[in-house]
Amino acid sequence: MHKQSHVWSIMALLGFMLLGPVASYCGQPVTGDVWAEKNPLVIKIGTTVPLQSPYWIGVRAMAPLIEDMTKGRYKFEYYPSSQLGGERDLAEGVKLGTMKLTVVSTGPLSAFNPMIKLVDLPYLFTSTQQAYKILDGSVGRQILDEFDKSGLHALAWYENGFRQLTNSKRPVKSPADLKGLKIRVMESPVMVDSLNAMGAQAVAMAWPEVFTSLQQGIIDGQENPAIIHLMNRTTEVTPYVSITNHFYNPAVVLVNLAWWKSLTDFDRQVFQRAAETSRDYMRWFIDHYSEDALKVAETQYKNKIERNVDIAAFQKSVQPVYDKYLKQIRATQP
């Protein structure tokens, strides 16, 4: 625990250095408000995943940056492992203003931003670098800006990584192997249709229900990035892992729009830059440790890692999903 606290301190220091231009906003040094330092605004951050997961790698790099740069006018409280609800609940809470900030996967967010369906399309990206180039550019920003229409504001894309299939029944190398398997997916119409097209029986389910449902045999498997598979202990109940890379699935840092507009220009810049700095660290972490997570799943939990997957067959199986959702998305554009 002591060692981990040093990690966050180092990240905060690095972020502080990167945030140099913000500190001199309008040529004015940051001045502390004694009352604000003694009575900071407490921001609760909830996620569905445990503290060791990539989301919290990002959040616990972002929060100290904001606290430091605002001289303690904001403080953060952490609520991991679905303590504040599922991902849709978290997004709804931020929209309603009962929470100020959260990090949510794209899967449940199409109800708040139809454009997010684009990002959820299967096999859309072939590499993380390709994904970063698109999402960090004008197209990605345009998609994020659509959240403003529903009372949310998106600061940045966070990282999940590529998702893999895991199940309790058998090795999966091709769509034919998925036939009859009940696979949990996020509450995303695109993801439901994609897994069904691949041959599975997709079951949309909020994350708090998943582990028990796997234990009881209500579902046969799930799909998640390797690190999430390890951190959420699905390694214990779904030992067959297929490296399908079927979704590149980012997350979004969301804040309440009305609250965001009430902030000073300086504070908005601090939050924005802190979100982007922590995003970059998350990406580095996942890029460096995803393979390690698979090795732990294989050696410690005796998971069987299937790398010889017929990706071309999976890509072909989901073509109808593209036809359906590209038509829907085009229909929403002026």
Map each language-model feature to its residues.
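Short, Φ-rich (hydrophobic/aromatic) sequence segments
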Residues: 134-136
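N-terminal secretory/targeting leader peptides
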Residues: 26-130, 139, 147-334
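Short, low-complexity disordered leader/linker segments with a strong preference
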Residues: 1-42
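Basic phosphate/pyrophosphate-binding loop/patch that engages nucleotide-derived ligands
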Residues: 143
